[in-house]
Amino acid sequence: MNIKPLGERVVIKKLEAEEKTKSGIVLTGTAKERPQEAEVVAVGPGAVVDGNRVAMEVKVGDKVLYSKYAGTEVKVDGEEYTILKQDDILAIVE
């Protein structure tokens, strides 16, 4: 992958949705909840505010939760990624 996000943008790769519910029900492709957990694969340099660059809060390798309909989906070398603003990331999963 060779995507270099600009500004305060982040490239994420979605983690797979659960195949089964906690009670053991197997979900089909259309019944699965759209995943909101992803791994950060690239991070931009950060926004410039009043002439100063603001450091990014996420880093490559972080697992994050993000807004359900945030970002733009792109396909590179057969892999699907989402490019979104750091503000669309809700939390880092530790």
Swiss-Prot record:
Key word Ribonucleoprotein present: no
Question: Where is this gene product found?
Answer: Cytoplasm
Q: Which domain of life is it from?
A: Bacteria
Q: Which InterPro entries match?
A: Chaperonin_GroES, Chaperonin_GroES_sf, Chaprnonin_Cpn10_CS, GroES-like_sf
Per the record, what is one GO cellular component?
Answer: cytoplasm
> What is this protein's function per UniProt?
Together with the chaperonin GroEL, plays an essential role in assisting protein folding. The GroEL-GroES system forms a nano-cage that allows encapsulation of the non-native substrate proteins and provides a physical environment optimized to promote and accelerate protein folding. GroES binds to the apical surface of the GroEL ring, thereby capping the opening of the GroEL channel.
From the Swiss-Prot or TrEMBL record, give the protein name: Co-chaperonin GroES
Task: Give the species this sequence originates from.
Answer: Clostridium beijerinckii (strain ATCC 51743 / NCIMB 8052)
